């Protein structure tokens, strides 16, 4: 395997995000390994330092019971003893882990075919001509939960073009096969909030092109997590050649927690982004996303995005449709002319947009999302959108002359083509001189009533389907 380690070639993804080696890809189902480009990622040790762990290869064969469970809706506690001493002793005695040396508290998982490790997924993602690696976990026969920045680059605004998933990868072995995906979901606010680290929304679902082997199973999700709780984080660190493609796990405790984030001091490094954060029942309580960041009042920790009702909502959404919504973005959402309306109660203004990213941002700024208003054609007469700096409202027109005249006045900004006019359903424009606002309606009866209440009818402004 040809492996290239480059800090710069990773789109600076690992510098900006702190913990996730670049990786995103789709490919035909096969058990062969792909050539990968790996970039370093920030590492935080149990002392919360940013230095690299001492280079030691430690090995862990997941702790197994005599009877293996192939699916894990009811996860067992077979892999994690109650105390740190018993954890290491039991794992070493079972031949699952190699001894810990130095500051690196990650253990090599030697047997990745046992519960819960067979459900931990090596991810390889492609952005353009670059390939990156990360981790994930099976949560359904065809769904992998991972970090949002593994599949969406906030610096470039690009989705991964493809993802390869290998459950239970063990060095050059793919015991359950190799799977591909080109459909992903994340929170829309992860796209629109900028490079916030750690992010409350840095979590994603990868939908595989087919179900994985029934032997893989998947892990359940859990809400409950508290400070001091014992956790483990299995995944695929890739900072050094000696660890690349091998599964490691590490144990530690929760040091800070809020409604969206889990702060911990468990060792993680490049490639661990997307690793599941597991409790003693092997339930997923979070996804590891960022390393060595400080958030007051919690402190300087590695961070993970916590499982909550919003995450469950995104997972449910991914099972039903490839389309996006106000809060959930997907790389497969189509621009089919759907036009959404928002209302600002303070300004008493309406706005129309076909951009759900814009709509989501506006809902954080006092606008109320009113849902789908109408559907426009893909080609036709352009409908221009302008913003009045004095009137603080948006205006829509198909007239270039009106657009240009308003721009020349100096208090209107042209914002480009909003959508296209076409179809048989007219949308009327009215103006209220007292309120100094425009209103758009496709309801002829509403227009008739408004004309008797001080609204000035300005005609048909465009047509919709």
Task: State where each predicted segment sits.
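C-terminal cap/linker of serine protease catalytic domains
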Residues: 289-332
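Sec-dependent N-terminal signal peptides of Gram-positive bacterial secreted proteins and lipoproteins
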Residues: 2-27
């Amino acid at each position: 395997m040809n492996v290239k380690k480059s800090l710069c070639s990773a789109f600076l993804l690992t510098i900006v995000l702190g913990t996730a080696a670049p990786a995103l890809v789709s490919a035909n189902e096969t058990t062969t390994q792909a050539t990968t480009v790996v970039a370093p990622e920030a590492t935080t040790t149990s002392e919360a330092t940013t230095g690299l762990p001492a280079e030691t290869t430690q090995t862990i064969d997941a702790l197994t019971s005599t009877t293996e469970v192939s699916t894990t809706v009811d996860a067992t506690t077979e892999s994690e003893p109650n105390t740190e001493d018993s954890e290491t002793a039991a794992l070493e005695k079972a031949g699952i882990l190699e001894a810990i040396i130095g500051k690196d508290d990650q253990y090599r998982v030697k047997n990745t075919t046992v519960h819960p490790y067979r459900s931990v997924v090596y991810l390889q993602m492609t952005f353009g001509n670059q390939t990156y690696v990360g981790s994930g976990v099976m949560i359904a026969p065809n769904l992998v939960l991972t970090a949002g920045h593994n599949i969406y680059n906030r610096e470039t605004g690009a989705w991964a073009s493809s993802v390869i998933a290998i459950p239970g990868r063990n060095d050059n072995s793919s015991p359950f096969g190799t799977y591909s995906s080109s459909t992903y979901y994340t929170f829309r606010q992860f796209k629109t909030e900028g490079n916030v680290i750690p992010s409350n929304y840095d979590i994603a679902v990868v939908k595989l092109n087919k179900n994985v082997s029934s032997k893989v199973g998947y892990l359940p999700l859990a809400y409950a997590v508290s400070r001091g709780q014992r956790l483990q984080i299995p995944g695929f660190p890739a900072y050094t050649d000696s660890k690349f493609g091998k599964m490691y796990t590490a144990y530690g405790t929760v040091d800070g927690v809020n409604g969206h984030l889990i702060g911990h001091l468990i060792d993680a490094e490049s490639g661990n982004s997307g690793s599941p954060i597991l409790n003693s029942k092997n339930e997923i309580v979070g996804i590891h996303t960022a390393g060595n960041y400080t958030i007051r009042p919690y402190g300087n920790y590695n961070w993970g995005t916590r499982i909550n009702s919003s995450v469950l909502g995104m997972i449910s959404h991914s099972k039903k449709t490839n389309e996006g919504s106000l809060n959930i973005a997907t790389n497969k959402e189509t621009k089919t002319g759907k036009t959404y309306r928002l209302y600002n109660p303070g300004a008493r203004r309406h706005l129309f947009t076909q951009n759900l990213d814009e709509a989501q941002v506006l809902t954080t700024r006092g606008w109320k999302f009113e849902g789908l208003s109408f559907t426009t054609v893909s080609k036709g007469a352009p409908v221009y959108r302008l913003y009045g700096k004095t009137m603080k409202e948006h205006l829509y027109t198909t007239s270039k002359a009106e657009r240009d005249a308003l721009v020349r006045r100096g208090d209107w900004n042209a914002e480009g083509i909003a959508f296209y006019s076409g179809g048989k359903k007219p949308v009327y424009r009215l103006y209220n001189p007292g309120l100094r606002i425009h209103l758009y309606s496709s309801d002829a009866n509403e227009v008739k009533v408004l004309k008797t209440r001080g609204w000035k009818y300005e005609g048909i402004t465009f047509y919709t389907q």
